[in-house]
């Protein structure tokens, strides 16, 4: 409860926490943006095969928002936790895969930055209110859909 009171009475701390939370959510949204269309496509294909009474295609591996772990699309290098820190790891790796040195799309840090900046602005504009929570959820959802 002490933390809640502190955040409610210190706007800078609240906005800073909102920015950090926004960066983390932005990192997760990158996963959603990349994987959800692929998951839907697989599901639609399976449904179509069922309706057309065709044999199902065996799925090679589990593919959802959690599994498999993130990896480089070029070389398959599994991304380590320290390579997955929002924005900072992109700068540290100079925008390239640590294994094959293939450039990483600028979309990833831009989504993270946009989410962090928008979250900070919302926290600053609405303050420590229920509207902030509602606007954050709406903004994150819209960002994922865009």
Roles of regions detected by a PLM:
Residues 1-146:
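A membrane-topology feature that recognizes alpha-helical transmembrane segments
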């Amino acid at each position: 409860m002490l933390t809640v009171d502190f955040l409610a009475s210190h706007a800078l701390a609240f906005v800073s926490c909102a920015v950090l939370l926004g960066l983390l959510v932005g990192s997760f949204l990158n996963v959603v943006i990349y994987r959800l269309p692929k998951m839907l496509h697989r599901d639609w294909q399976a449904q179509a095969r069922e309706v057309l009474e065709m044999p199902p295609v065996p799925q090679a591996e589990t593919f959802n928002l959690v599994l498999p772990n993130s990896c480089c699309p070029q070389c398959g290098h599994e991304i380590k936790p320290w390579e997955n820190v929002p924005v900072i790891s992109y700068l540290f790796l100079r925008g390239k895969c640590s294994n094959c040195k293939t450039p990483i799309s600028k979309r990833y840090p831009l989504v993270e930055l946009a989410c962090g900046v928008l979250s900070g602005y919302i926290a600053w504009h609405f303050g420590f209110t229920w509207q902030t929570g509602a606007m954050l959820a709406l903004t994150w959802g819209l960002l994922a859909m865009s």
